[in-house]
Amino acid sequence: MPKQKVAILGPGSWGTALAQVLNDNGHEVRLWGNIPEQINEINTRHTNSHYFKDIVLDEAIKATLDLKEALADIDAILFVVPTKVTRLVAKQVAQVLDHKAIVMHASKGLEPGTHERLSTILEEEIPAQLRSEVVVVSGPSHAEETIVRDITLITAASKDITAARYVQTLFSNHYFRLYTNTDVIGVETAGALKNIIAVGAGALHGLGYGDNAKAAVITRGLAEITRLGVKLGADPLTYSGLSGVGDLIVTGTSVHSRNWRAGAALGRGEKLKDIENNMGMVIEGISTTKVAYEIAQELGVYMPITSAIYKSIYEGADIKESILGMMSNEFRSENEWHT
């Protein structure tokens, strides 16, 4: 692939790691953010120490506070901003972008209030003449591992397979590999909903439960993720792939996962506000729990783990009692994931 110019909107941990992947592939990378100190640090010290204390970035990776500068003559745009500001940033892009570009996102969440997936938001806010079909970049990927060039395999999903293949080629190299998919609904819901299950798995750890319990919540969590996703129009096979079970494993079992760590802290009895302040990063699983619970209630989808986490976070229920309460739920067949 010829050298591409790529704007990454959001210089957080994942945005920075993906910037390095693209730079390794010989592409021109521009990181855009709104914190002057962070942008200056990336440009002068070539570090992003809030997320990676010991990593030095290539000097070719540039950062800017100016969105117009970031998007000038760009080939592709990657959104890696928190879910709650995706619409706002998309509106800003639509005002500045003056030519057609590939539009991608690598965030995992559902918009509070509207319950919309992020690709839908980008489609609504960026005119069709300025973008490709949106490509979703998602899968089992800790930024802490990708930044040190550990082997990572994820998914590029789009309704337009040509756009997905472009992104596959753009990112893939000897340590970072993408597979394509056309099931955007499945890939996005898998990426968003697994954060809820990771909170639950972390809570079990914080409460002192062992591997049996954690395996149970991850496996049954996959069942309810699939149940809701299929109701929304997803292909059930997607949930057995990288963006489904793959992402669920990596997020639901690792201390690198902020959602798992948040759940573990909740299990130990810590207050949510204190957890969020101590972590200093967005915990998407917290807001996604509320959105998923509301969707499940509206559509009549059985999601007992999501319900238990919701009641603990938003209704003040004891998290141990909420989780143990699932043990007395109605008996079901294991294969009834679709009901």
UniProtKB/Swiss-Prot annotation:
One of the record's GO molecular function terms: NAD binding
Record-level GO cellular component terms: cytosol
Residues the record lists as binding sn-glycerol 3-phosphate: K108, G139, S141, K194, D247, S257, R258, N259
Reaction(s) catalysed by this chain's protein: sn-glycerol 3-phosphate + NAD(+) = dihydroxyacetone phosphate + NADH + H(+); sn-glycerol 3-phosphate + NADP(+) = dihydroxyacetone phosphate + NADPH + H(+)
InterPro entries assigned: 6-PGluconate_DH-like_C_sf, 6PGD_dom2, G3P_DH_NAD-dep, G3P_DH_NAD-dep_C, G3P_DH_NAD-dep_N, NAD(P)-bd_dom_sf
Highest taxon of the lineage: Bacteria
Protein name: Glycerol-3-phosphate dehydrogenase [NAD(P)+]
Name of the gene: gpsA
